[in-house]
Amino acid sequence: MDKKASRIRRATRARRKIAELGATRLVVHRTPRHVYAQVIASNGSEVIAAASTVEKAIREQVKNTGNVDAAKAVGKAIAERALEKGVETVAFDRSGFQYHGRVAALAESAREAGLKF
């Protein structure tokens, strides 16, 4: 099994467990160049809030879009947008990525901005 297939297997398993809880989830995806985050409703069919380093507002705040500082900016933005929509508690879905580096930075930044998970 290659690296991507292993990550997808881990992500599927985690999503199944989150679906059993019926919780709103904060989904993180990372590429070498960008970081993306979405808050998805418990039914799985509605995106409540989204933020990424592709957005002009976030891109202007950071020098490089693929590093820890960019992930912190995305974490803060997603937390603010989720709180505006009335979502305070989420389940963190790391999409099979290791809780380290950019993924951890995004999570810590979202927690500091007021999101609970």
Curated annotation (Swiss-Prot):
InterPro entries: Ribosomal_uL18_bac-type (IPR004389), Ribosomal_uL18_bac/euk (IPR005484)
GO biological process: translation
GO terms under cellular component: cytosolic large ribosomal subunit
Record keywords, A-Z: Ribonucleoprotein, Ribosomal protein, RNA-binding, rRNA-binding
Keyword RNA-binding among UniProt keywords: yes
Gene Ontology molecular functions: 5S rRNA binding; structural constituent of ribosome
SUPFAM superfamilies membership: Translational machinery components
A Pfam family recorded for this sequence: Ribosomal_L18p
Keyword Ribonucleoprotein among UniProt keywords: yes
Protein's job: This is one of the proteins that bind and probably mediate the attachment of the 5S RNA into the large ribosomal subunit, where it forms part of the central protuberance.
Family, similarity comment: Belongs to the universal ribosomal protein uL18 family.
PANTHER family attached to this UniProt entry: 39S RIBOSOMAL PROTEIN L18, MITOCHONDRIAL, LARGE RIBOSOMAL SUBUNIT PROTEIN UL18M
Alphabetized NCBIfam families for the sequence: L18_bact
Quaternary state and interactors: Part of the 50S ribosomal subunit; part of the 5S rRNA/L5/L18/L25 subcomplex. Contacts the 5S and 23S rRNAs.
Listed name of the protein: Large ribosomal subunit protein uL18
Top-level taxonomy: Bacteria, Pseudomonadati, Pseudomonadota, Gammaproteobacteria, Vibrionales
Gene transcribed to yield this protein: rplR
